[in-house]
Amino acid sequence: MIIDALSPFGRGASAPLAGRTILQIVPPVDVGGDERTTLAITAALAETGARALVATDSRELAGELQAIGGLFVRFPAATKNPLAMTFNMLRLQRIIAAERVDLVHVRSRWAAWAAVRACRKAKRPLVTSLPGDGGRKRPRTSFETAVAEGDYVIALSEFAAGRAEGLFPATPNRLRVVRPGMDLSKLQPERVTGRRVSDMRARWGVAAHERVVLMPARLAPARGPQTLIEAAALVKSRGLDDIRFILAGEAAKPVFARELDALAVKCGVQSIITRVGASPDPPAAFIAAAVVAFPAADAEGVTRASMEAAAIGALTIISDVGAAREIIAAPPHEDAEARTGWLVPPREPAALADAICAALALGASARDAVRRRSRAKIAAAYSLERMTRDTLAVYAEALER
């Protein structure tokens, strides 16, 4: 079930939340998507008249939470120690009682076990959030199944919801799809200055005439950089001599970085492939590139960055795994006239090379049309406003049970 503006749960969600105390439990996070989501939900709760608490070990959140009307509660949400998890259950019971919590939303799979038991003891509704890909293996212990034991279970995509139904057969009637939200105001191409773009290209060391194929992802096997290197060799063999491939991300392990360098030499493309660190200015990087590629090897490799690239209108290529079809519209799943990017089979360098060449060959009008459709598709499904509205609708539904 996808909660949207037309859903009865999307209307008037603020009414049952006014005056309620909502506790979010999140693991320590770096600055990025998870942290932004927590802050956005906190701000939305405050606007509805609810009292918003956030239990986490991330002290960096404390100041920002207070500025938007939230309250910080120190809580070791990321612990995997069974004894510590038992103590967490007792901590949560005390927090729920002392703060008169009406509903708990846990975004940490490890804290879910404690939250399930604390909420049952307190007779409070619980919302849980699944991992981004819905989970990759059948759970064997109560610690692993707890994330699907909420009164309502949030999945970040239809793909994740479908996978969860297979892993957790008892969840279908409790599953709700709430897609990630992004601050689209920061992903407007007109807001990216020429100076930012030129600075990015200078950082990469590319010449003015060179077109860039960018892979903005952590360099790990699941992200598929090997496939891109092999595809680069095929692109080069087709006579395209003005293309540079930029791998913008930190290596998961130094040995893997060396393996990638060795593969580039083996494929004869070491002169056109450059490894750089993670981009300090992703919007400028997307605009500076002719094509942005995400050659993920599996569902785990479909990242938030692919949504951001599509949101700003970059010509985006994604492996056809996980939730990729929800991000990109492309044949054969959609009509060619509806194309917003390219979907390619994972681990197939030839298919990736074909998509890169097709994107690079587009004329100006066709390229602009793909970009407009891409921006519109992402804006309709992945806005911060939609995410907060749909999340609060799940809270309201849980409280009205």
Feature names for model-found ranges:
Residues 106-112:
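Short His-centered aromatic/hydrophobic patch
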Residues 120, 126-158, 162:
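A conserved, positively charged/aromatic
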Residues 366-381, 390-393:
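A short, well-ordered alpha-helix in the C-terminal region of glycosyltransferases
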Residues 54, 315-318, 325-329, 335:
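Short hydrophobic beta-strand element within catalytic cores of glycosyltransferases
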Residues 329-349, 359-364:
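Conserved acidic donor-binding segment of nucleotide-sugar-dependent glycosyltransferases
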Residues 287-301, 314:
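Acidic donor-binding loop of glycosyltransferase active sites
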Residues 32-40, 211-234, 245, 258, ...:
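A conserved mid-protein helix/loop that constitutes part of the nucleotide-sugar donor-binding site
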Residues 249, 257-277:
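Nucleotide-activated donor-binding/catalytic signature segment of Leloir-type glycosyltransferases, i.e.
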